[in-house]
Amino acid sequence: LNLDYNSEEDFIKKFKIINSLVPISIALFANSSIVEKKNSGYMSYRSKVWQKTSRGGLPEIFFDNMNFEKYSDFAINFPLLFIQNNKEYLSGKNYLFSDFMSGKIKEIDRRLPSETDLATHLSTIFTENRLKKYIELRSMDTCGWDCLCAGPAFNTGILYGNLDETFELISKWDKNKIINAYLEAPKKGFNTELMGKDLLYWSSLLLNLSKKGLENRDVLNKSNENETKFLGHLEKLIDNRVTNADHMIGKFSKNENLNELYDK
């Protein structure tokens, strides 16, 4: 999911919010429990895999009022994955992007990076959220048609319609507890604890903040409906205390035919 910002101050707030909400995003949108025709034991196996990726995760620095300069320092001092040199791809092992900028890479005749090289490098930083010319949110599993617009609507309500109230809420949270909840959420889902409450509680509270934000935006369709209509699926999940992953696990236990299962 890609969202924009209108100033550095706006970016700082939005980036801190979305990183603080990563555990909630994992739990609320968990939908990758079945792996290789088996129950993986995780609500979001996809999130678990990304947590084990050396270039992924939720860096502590992301909670320290990350501004453009700090993110730039983070990105240029991040290891290279590969280098595209003409039509050839070379391993970037043992080099940082700052080495590239300093002309230290002998394998490419010490040439300096282009804007395309920078864009490629930024796209290989697999953190839960990342900055390009926009903010990219990466914590949500994909879902069916009935909830396809729920993720964009949920985050739009929070980040565009109710930014300050949400920022005030998450500013009270401890980053170490957020990171711990992030590590537990792929397996425990709504039962994960954060700041003394489970993620079901926080999901419900944040859904209300999002709903309020979408009402504040008052963007209407041709039928005079506002954007809160897209939150309906999430409201059902929270009311029933189950995730999309729970639904899939329940159906899977009754039907081993995955083709039929996904058709449903």
What are the language-model segments listed below?
Residues N2-R130:
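Loop-rich catalytic cores of soluble enzymes, especially ATP-dependent carboxylate-amine ligases
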Residues K13, S20, A27, D73-N77, ...:
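Charged/polar, solvent-exposed surface patches and flexible loops
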Residues I24, L28-N31, E128, G161, ...:
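A structural signal for alpha-helix termini and helix-coil/disorder junctions
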Residues R46-G57, Y182-N191, L237-I249:
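Short, charged low-complexity intrinsically disordered segments located at boundaries
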Residues F68, N94, E115, A119, ...:
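Alpha-helix initiation and N-capping motif
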Residues N129-R130, Y134-N226:
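Substrate-recognition/cap regions that form aromatic- and gly/pro-loop-enriched pockets
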Residues S210-K264:
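C-terminal amphipathic alpha-helical interaction region
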